Amino acid sequence: VFQLIDLLKALYAHDCRFVVCGGVACVLQGVERATYDLDVLVVMEPDNLQKVLCTAAGLELVPRIPQPAEQLLDPELRQKWKEDKNALVYTFASHNSPLQLDILLDYPISFDDLMQRADLIDIDGCLIPVSSKEDLLTIKKAIEPPRTKDRIDIEELEALLAEEQQTG
């Protein structure tokens, strides 16, 4: 059974261009909570997506939808998923673990902007790009309606930022 850390290290090892977002990013930034899905914003270029697909396959993650994972490479099909099905993520799931990988199909912050402000967090020698606390707050505050876990994340992120400002 693989863990979220193994998935992060595998994405790094395959030289995928990604930024960790969502609940895992909150945890890596200091928020205490449980989560089983890894939300990542990736560069939607064929070579990078192919690396992501290889990483998922290597960890025996399969698409949640009954379609070949290679469909993720088709920009027109991704757009159709967003328009016709209001799809926000493309999910890879495990048959032997509750963990999953969510590839964000749409995000209010561009990859380049997110990456520029990302914090590089060292996980077993792998420098993992993690969405900044400020960007996480921006996204969490934009969720309508906010879920209970989003409200808690907002409170904790604001407290962490206030603590950082006090300690300089």
Predicted regions and their residues:
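Compositionally biased terminal segments of proteins
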Residues: 1-168
